[in-house]
Amino acid sequence: MKTTILLMFLWGLSCALPVARYQNTESKSSEEWKGHLAQTPTPPLESSESSEESKLSSEEQANEDPSDSTESEEVLGLDDQQHVHRPAGGLSRRGGSEGDNKDDDEDESGDDTFGDDDGGPGPEERRSGGDSRLGSDEDSADTTRSREDSTPQGDEGARDTTSESRDLDREDEGNSRPEGGDSTPDSDSEEHWVGGGSEGDSSHGDGSEFDDEGMQSDDPGAYRSERGNSRISDAGLKSTQSKGDDEEQASTQDSHESPAAAYPRRKFFRKSRLPEEDGRGELDDSRTIEVMSDSTENPDSKEAGLGQSREHSKSESRQESEENRSPEDSQDVQDPSSESSQEVDLPSQENSSESQEEALHESRGDNPDNATSHSREHQADSESSEEDVLDKPSDSESTSTEEQADSESHESLRSSEESPESTEEQNSSSQEGAQTQSRSQESPSEEDDGSDSQDSSRSKEDSNSTESVSSSEEEAQTKNTEVESRKLTVDAYHNKPIGDQDDNDCQDGY
């Protein structure tokens, strides 16, 4: 605590005294300072602080009377006695050196104003701090010190004092190095950190404050290891997804030429990725069940259904280009292909009515429900709308999406059937209703679409004819009124009285 308070006081002094650097001090004050340093063999940290205080006070009062310098030396003597009375154990010295390291690192990083405001105390403190904590050879430290001391400082006495204080610091360094051995590894790692290296210790003391929180990004080794762990876990998840994806891809690769073939695979990938965010425990089980059901599934019926749905989507993509020329022919082409694909997909549609309510809410979020509801909305819209050519492609797209969604719901129903519940009874009970529902929804709806579209075209022609008749009647009425008004004006002009010869209405002579 005392060291931190003293350091705060010194920091305030150095901020409050931006005096000129290295002013010429009198030889008398420098000799007295030398005597004080020789009297007090304190540990290196305290000697550096006392020398800093003495230098501050001597710089403060350099321009004043020489009698004031003796007062500053008395103040310095009091400070030195304070330093002597302080306990010089290993703990206090280590705490002081840590605090000194803190100031030193601030000085090096440029946040503090020691080296900038008053150039004297900054390098002096940095020198002594470096002596107390560096385990490097003394010759390099001596060269840096002599280089810093070669700046114009005044009399030769001041240089003698700096050299003697260096000798004292060296002696005390030799004494205090076994005691303060605890602080040397921390300070070494601190210097590495300030120099831009990758040691984990921060610039404050022993580095335990920021080890767990902020300074992890400075350590590239730990960052790489975390990244590698996250990549391994991601690779595990992706491998479980890609298993099911590869099996479905192998079963559907025979009829893969059309561009709509990528759609159910993408959907399956989304299906396995969406619930992963919600509940990973249940979804791993459901994913493995889906993979097993894909391997144990009847491949012939699935390939037949998917192949016909893909041929159906091919024929629809051709029809979209042909429908602008001949909508009635494309309607004839569309109906048998859609009916044949619906006959193949009937068992999957029977299962879909149940899997849309139960299995889909368990294993995946939204896709087939949305697709079937969208397709039903499209069918309802196409029944009520009056535009032929625009409704046919949307209707064919909705049927293809519904068939793909039903095939996928068939897979998810297989996964839900493996959990032995009473789904088979519900299947058998809901088969008849689903058959009638699917037939009444799809195959008659397309025929109704054709008849409705023909009726709508007839009603359009009728409305056009009635509009043309009504417009012609209105034109005839307007013509009749114009003719009548002209007749009236001509009659009025010709039936004038005899005495009225000019063009105005009033008669002449009145």
Curated annotation (Swiss-Prot):
Tissue: Expressed in fetal brain, bone and tooth particularly in odontoblast, but not in ameloblast. Not expressed in liver and skin.
Tagged with keyword Plastid: no
InterPro entries: DMP1
Motif residue range(s): Cell attachment site: 364-366
Compositional bias of kind Basic and acidic residues: 123-180, 273-288, 299-328, 358-367, 407-417, 481-499
Keyword field contains Cell inner membrane: no
PTM notes: Phosphorylated in the cytosol and extracellular matrix and unphosphorylated in the nucleus. Phosphorylation is necessary for nucleocytoplasmic transport and may be catalyzed by a nuclear isoform of CK2 and can be augmented by calcium. Phosphorylated (in vitro) by FAM20C in the extracellular medium at sites within the S-x-E/pS motif.
Any GO molecular function: extracellular matrix binding
A biological process term (GO) from this entry: ossification
Signal peptide bounds: 1-16
Pfam families on file: DMP1
Extent of Acidic residues compositional bias: 61-77, 101-119, 500-510
Localization (cell): Nucleus; Cytoplasm; Secreted, Extracellular space, Extracellular matrix
Quaternary structure, from the entry: Interacts with importin alpha.
Name by which UniProt lists this protein: Dentin matrix acidic phosphoprotein 1
Species: Bos taurus (Bovine)
